[in-house]
Amino acid sequence: MTMSLISDELGQASTKKSSVKGQPVVLRLQGAHRRGCGQRTGSHGGNNSRQQEDSMDKHFVLSKIKDYEAHLDNVAPLMESDDQLIMNELIREINNTCHVKIRGFSDLCDSYIKGAGSIIAKHINCFHSHLIRSALVFHLVGSKKHECGRVNGCEQIIWNLYNEYRNSVPFVDNSIMMEYDSAFAQLKSKKLLDQLVSLAQDPYLFSFFPQTMKMLARWRDPSMEKVIMGYFANPGLVKTQIAMSLGRSADDASILQREYSRWDSHGQYTVIICLRYYPSIQVLDKLMHFEALTVEDMEKNLSKCCTHNDRIWIKDVYSDRLFTIRKSITEIKKQLDIL
């Protein structure tokens, strides 16, 4: 189907996110065009007439844009046809049962809907797309604030969804993992303790679950303490384990370096936050030594900066890291009563 792209002085083509997160779709309208595009006259009256016509044109185009946006909400152009059929059935059932007017997937991702959790639980495994599945799991967890109850057995449902995703890909997508991290952290379910600790034992996955890891540390389970202490005491071994977890993907140097960087900037600082829940003199000494090394590393990088902006960026990066380290030091000192 031929589409005409609206541009010129009526405004640039509207851009709208597709129903699938993170995949922008440029909005194109069929048959929408400016009327009365003749040459402007030199008379004052002609200019007023042309301004009125332009104003009418803009209203016409805006109405077409709204119509097409509604169409995009109902038909996700980047969804597989099978998933689209399932989505249509899911939305129809939610609208009829919960007495709401959900137009499409984007609406479903943006709102808690009272009574929708059990309906979504019935359909969620039917979707082929793990992106769609992950975007809907928050409905299973529910929300007291929005009077949305938790689906019975949702802990195991969500764990199975995550596990199926993890086993289907060589390396994971951050946006999908964020949804599962949020879900596990909100569940706060000790029914999943063993599974989540096993997840924590893989440093590659550890970096993707900061909220969940902090929750496990707060529970002060001995098995989690062993994981945290191991990561902090053996940083070199961590990167070996990351490479092993990636398997063949580790043969790609760019992928391996990306995951090493993720650990350096995220994983190890989640470890440092978790250490607050396992206070000891030994941990305190190691943290203070790590603080000194971080300051030294910052000074080395600052000395290599060629511009003022580079120095600002380096200071911003290291100030966040030092804040995390120093807060953990302070918390441990309080618990040891040595402030």
Name each model feature, range by range.
Residues 64-71, 93-104, 128-137, 169-180, ...:
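Generic helix N-cap/helix-start motif at coil->alpha-helix transitions
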